[in-house]
Amino acid sequence: MKKNNIHIIKMGGTIEFIDPDYQKINDKLMKLDASIDKYLSSLINPHFTYDIQTVCQKDSREINQEDLNKLATAIKSTKQENILITHGTFTMKNTAKFLENFIAKENLNKKIILTGAMIPIIGFSISDAGFNLGYSLASFAVVRPGVYLCMNGGMFKPEEVEKNIELLRFQ
C-alpha cells in the first residue's frame, strides 16, 4: 500500500494557540507546546510521511496579502500533491477562495485542505482540533485536486461554507 506524503503548511490560528485569548492563558498558566508537529510525532505516530513548513503564525484576522503570497509560493514550490494548511477559522474561507484562484491561474493539480479549530489542539480535555486534523488528513484519500475546508466532520468548497460563531461550527 502506497503511503501518502503530505506537506503541512502552518499559518497559525487557535489550533496552535495563536489566538489572543488562548495565548494569554497558555503564556501565564500552561506553557504548552501546542504545535501540530509535536501532536503528530508524539501522539499519533501516523502511517504516512509528512513535512511541515511554517509560513506565518498569526491570528487569521491579521493575515495580509504578503502572507497569502508566501503561502502561494509555498504551495507552488512543493513537489507534494497533498497539502494541508492549518489556519485560523475567522478568515479561512477567504484564504481558500484566494487559493482556488491561485491554483486555477497556475494550473496546479494539487489537493489543498484547510483546517483549524475553535479550541487549541493541546491543553484542553475537549477540543475539536484533533478530530478536524484527523478528518482532514484522511480526506486526502477521497478528494480530487482542488481546495477544500474540513471542519466539524464536513468537507466544504469555499463558496459553500460559512462559520457559525453561535454554534461554533462550519456549515
Language-model regions, residue ranges each:
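Active-site histidine-anchored catalytic micro-motif
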Residues: 2-171
